[in-house]
Amino acid sequence: MKELIEFLEKTGLKTEADSLRNGGTELNPQSNIGTLGAKKLAAALKDNKSLKYLNLIGSYIGEEGARALAEALKDNESLKELYLTPADISTVTLNRIKEYIQRNTDLYYKEQQQYNKQLISSIKANEIKQAESIIPFIDPKYSNSVDENNNTALHYAVDKNLEKLSISLINKMSIETISIGNMYNNTALHYATDNGLEVISWFLINNMTQKALDMVNTDGNTALDYAIHNRHLL
């Protein structure tokens, strides 16, 4: 990694070099790093387990550089996205790279699914410290896991009046995930308004789709109905 950082600095890519030096997970050089740069990247990838995104569009690394990257990816399971300019790279080498990236993506998906499963289980079991320790490892792209009742971790956190944990999850999840309704068409907002949780309700309202805000559960109630019933002004 040290050689790669020095190479990036010498080629004028100081911002990218500083990012890697500080543990950055993405590399998007805006200039052509060529075959030499690709080889230094390959050497770094053999030891680096933090880089997840690499964009080399515009860099003409050729067959030699691509082969070096493919060889490095054989033992690297952390890089999930790699974009290349395919000029002068054989189909065989490109396919080899694609296979390794797909392998890494599949492994990462399984890992994220396991984290989400553990998170839901921890909240259901009231193991709050355990749940808090898992959240930093959750990737927002994969935060939409649900259990057999179509509940997300957020459903359980809100239903158990866990304000701090709920806000942490809201900040981590996408709008689409926050808006998920369970098997009874209850969103997290239904639970928040039914439990009189005004702070969480406001956080949710500002991070949900309109369709979710208007969702009617199997009892015929919207989240607003519960808010009115509990005399909470939203």
Swiss-Prot record:
Transmembrane segments: none annotated. InterPro entries: Ankyrin_rpt, Ankyrin_rpt-contain_sf, LRR-containing_regulator, LRR_dom_sf. SMART domains: LRR_RI. ANK repeats lie at residues 149-180, 184-213. Keywords: ANK repeat, Repeat. PANTHER family: LEUCINE-RICH REPEAT-CONTAINING PROTEIN, LEUCINE-RICH REPEAT-CONTAINING PROTEIN 34. This is Putative ankyrin repeat protein RF_0063. It comes from Rickettsia felis (strain ATCC VR-1525 / URRWXCal2). The lineage of its organism: Bacteria, Pseudomonadati, Pseudomonadota, Alphaproteobacteria, Rickettsiales.
